[in-house]
């Protein structure tokens, strides 16, 4: 049976999975679950993922619903090149270290930056107090500095000389605030150079394809009242 991926490329972990599968020629059928239409909250999607979140994966009768678990499953099943998730114990531990940190580090601040800068005022019609936005962007800059100083340092990629899952997960997170108009790479020259290397390693066409939705997010139409009422509680819980 064909591998099935339930994705919305508005979502940063969905973009990571999409790029990884495409780059490694993993055959899959994509089901687009449009978050801005609340499709992830439907009863039909709940049968795929009871937590009503994307991404989700079905491989025959086997289902996974967490992005890192999906990436590791694909890396193991399809025997992708070693640099993505190295066999070397310490190199693999470095990938694991980044993946463990990013959930409560970079992801939270990137998500909040996008929602506070664009999605609340443009999509949901809710203005964010300037002091809240300023605090969010300050938190983002702190985590960018951690990414640069702790994880990247002076290496070409986060783990060493080659791209890994850590880089892919990190760059798709950073494209959230980039899509929101945040000058993410200003003042972070090592991150700016790393971004260029990651884009080249992935392939510019694939990178742009995966990020087309997020780079146009500022132009999204406002949500209707019903969708806003459905989404607001989950959005507020997500960005706390």
Swiss-Prot record:
Location, primary (coarse class): cytoplasm
MF terms (GO), sorted A to Z: alkylhalidase activity; glutathione peroxidase activity; glutathione transferase activity
EC top class named in words: transferase
Catalytic activity, EC: 2.5.1.18
Localization (cell): Cytoplasm; Nucleus
InterPro entries: Glutathione-S-Trfase_C-like, Glutathione-S-Trfase_C_sf, Glutathione_S-Trfase, Glutathione_S-Trfase_N, GST_C, GST_C_Theta, GST_N_Theta, GST_Theta
Catalytic activity of the protein: RX + glutathione = an S-substituted glutathione + a halide anion + H(+)
CDD domains: GST_C_Theta (cd03183), GST_N_Theta (cd03050)
Keyword terms: Cytoplasm, Nucleus, Transferase
GST C-terminal domain: residues covered: 88-222
Parts forming coiled coils: none
Domain called GST N-terminal: residue spans: 2-82
Entry GO terms, CC: cytosol; nucleus
Protein family: Belongs to the GST superfamily. Theta family.
Assembly notes: Homodimer.
Function recorded in the entry: Conjugation of reduced glutathione to a wide number of exogenous and endogenous hydrophobic electrophiles. Also binds steroids, bilirubin, carcinogens and numerous organic anions. Has dichloromethane dehalogenase activity.
The protein, known as: Glutathione S-transferase theta-1
Source organism: Mus musculus
Gene it is expressed from: Gstt1
């Amino acid at each position: 049976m064909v591998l099935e991926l339930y994705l919305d490329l508005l979502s940063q972990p969905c973009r990571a999975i999409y790029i990884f599968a495409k780059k490694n020629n993993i055959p899959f059928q994509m089901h687009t679950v449009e978050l801005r239409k609340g499709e992830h909250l439907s009863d039909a999607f709940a049968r795929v993922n009871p937590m009503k979140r994307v991404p989700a994966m079905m491989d025959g009768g086997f289902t996974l619903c967490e992005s890192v678990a999906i990436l590791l499953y694909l890396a193991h099943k399809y025997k992708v090149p070693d640099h993505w998730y190295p066999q070397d114990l310490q190199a693999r531990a470095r990938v694991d270290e980044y993946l463990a940190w990013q959930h409560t580090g970079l992801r939270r601040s990137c998500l909040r930056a996008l929602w506070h800068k664009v999605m609340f005022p443009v999509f949901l019609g809710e203005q964010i107090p300037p002091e809240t936005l300023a605090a969010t962007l300050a938190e983002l800059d702190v985590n960018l500095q951690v990414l640069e100083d702790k994880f990247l340092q002076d290496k070409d990629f986060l783990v060493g000389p080659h791209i890994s899952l850590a880089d892919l997960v990190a760059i798709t997170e950073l494209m959230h605030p980039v899509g929101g108009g945040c000058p993410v790479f200003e003042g972070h020259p090592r991150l700016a150079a790393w971004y260029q290397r990651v884009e080249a390693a992935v392939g510019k066409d694939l990178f742009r394809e995966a990020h087309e939705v997020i780079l146009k997010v500022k132009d999204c139409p406002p949500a209707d009242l019903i969708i806003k009422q459905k989404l607001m509680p989950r959005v507020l819980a997500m960005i706390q």
